[in-house]
Design a protein with these regions (language model features):
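Extracellular glycan-interacting surfaces
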Residues: 1-147
Length: 147
């Protein structure tokens, strides 16, 4: 076998993270320094995801192993009003909503890691750049610190 570079994902920006849907292996998400991309056909074609996602540094992607339509994306691009934070899609990555809305945002919106609790899939761990680890119930927008 030989290596083959895919078309449709920028080649001139860092690739931060890649996640594959465990139920639909042809569906893959790629987080770059500028945007989030997705393929439905195993990498033959790619599309840039929008749907309320900000510009920026996508550093973490988490797909619900029991429901591939639920996807979380962590963004590390932080400015005063836009970017950074945790975003959730319930339609396979077409539309997105913040799970840390304004007024209740993480102390650091620079998100670096996401994980489900191995004992409770309703709990999400959020690792930040400089403010520790936070826990959020998956269906909630209330974050609590584990520090």
């Amino acid at each position: 076998k030989t290596w083959r570079q895919v078309d449709g994902v920028p080649r001139d920006v860092p690739i931060n993270t890649i996640a594959q849907d465990p139920q639909r292996p042809d569906r893959v998400f790629v987080g770059t320094k500028q945007a989030l991309f997705m393929t439905h056909d195993g990498g033959e074609t790619w599309s840039r995801r929008g749907g309320n996602l900000p510009f920026g540094d996508f550093t973490a992607i988490l797909i619900n192993p029991r429901n591939g339509d639920e996807v979380f994306a962590g963004n590390a691009y932080q400015t005063t009003d836009v970017g950074g934070g945790v975003f959730r899609s319930t339609d396979g990555g077409t539309t997105w909503a913040r799970i840390d809305p304004k007024g209740r945002r993480l102390p650091s919106q620079r998100i670096w890691a996401l994980a489900f609790d191995a004992h409770d899939q309703n709990v999400l761990f959020v690792g930040s750049h400089s403010a520790g680890v936070y826990v959020v119930p998956r269906m909630s927008d209330t974050l609590s610190s584990t520090q």
